[in-house]
Amino acid sequence: MLKTAAAALMIVLMSVGTAVSQTQDDGPIATASPRSESADSVRLREALAYSNPLPRGAPTQDYPLVAWCDALVTGHADLGDTLTNRNPEDTELVRLGRLEAQDFRSALVAAEPRQSAAVKAEAQRAAAAAKAQWAPLLANTDETSRSQAFGLFFGLPGRCEHAARRIRENITTPPATPAEVGLQDAPAAE
């Protein structure tokens, strides 16, 4: 009995391994959300993104946050453009960064008429602060240092993409909490 179960398990594991191997050989793995993503899936990802803390210096309001995210990803792409010895992966990161920045800018343009002067000023300050972080690296004449810095950029908070969608679509209700999407027990009513 155990030998039969072990043999069956091996067959399953081998077939899963083959399927994974074939899938990985088929090309890049898509990490962006598909166009057909369900509303529940978006709500779940949004709840997770908003439940995680933002990095130090990141604005908490959506509009300034999107401006900050745009400046960070644009700075990273600008740094990548300074490299003369880019490999194909670096070139792809620059391309994807430019697309992400374009998405952030289109969200900012769509939402700009609805923002107060104070929020717009906060967004400008946030973008300037993020851009200033890249300035010393962009000015560095040592390509090895620039290349290392380019490789160390860990990406943006997940909240950036959701904040961009929320300001573009004029969503003013608070994002769902993890408890509201079933990830945590809801707090007890007092």
Feature names for model-found ranges:
Residues 17-21:
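Sec/Tat signal peptide C-region and signal peptidase I cleavage site
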Residues 55-114:
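Short N-proximal segments of mature Sec-exported proteins
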Residues 100-190:
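Compact alpha-helical subdomains of small soluble proteins
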Residues 6-16:
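Bacterial N-terminal signal peptides
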Residues 1-4:
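Positively charged n-region of N-terminal signal peptides that target proteins for export
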Residues 24-48:
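Acidic, low-complexity proline/glycine-rich segments
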